[in-house]
């Protein structure tokens, strides 16, 4: 029982670390350059917003 709980916690921690690391790497590589609330009208919406998505070409909206 304890081993199962430890394994579940380990998987959850690895998943969270993977998400955080991928976001940090994305910013370091300059794949994203717009923060939430920034206008994305003149930018390609794919990958331009660091957090969230480009909402109808108007602004970056966090998820």
UniProtKB/Swiss-Prot annotation:
Protein name: Conotoxin Cal6.37
Tissues with expression: Expressed by the venom duct.
Cellular component annotations (GO), alphabetically ordered: extracellular region
Gene Ontology molecular function terms on file: toxin activity
Function: Probable neurotoxin.
Domain of life the protein comes from: Eukaryota
Signal peptide (from-to): 1-22
Species name: Californiconus californicus
S-S bridge residues: 32-50, 40-54, 49-60
Localization, UniProt: Secreted
Domain notes for this protein: The cysteine framework is VI/VII (C-C-CC-C-C).
Main location: secreted
Keyword annotations of the record: Disulfide bond, Knottin, Neurotoxin, Secreted, Signal, Toxin
């Amino acid at each position: 029982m304890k081993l199962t709980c430890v394994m579940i916690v380990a998987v959850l921690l690895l998943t969270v670390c993977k998400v955080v690391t991928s976001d940090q790497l994305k910013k370091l590589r300059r794949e994203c350059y717009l923060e939430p609330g920034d206008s994305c009208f003149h930018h390609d919406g794919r990958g331009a917003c660091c957090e969230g998505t480009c909402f109808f070409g108007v602004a970056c909206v966090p998820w």
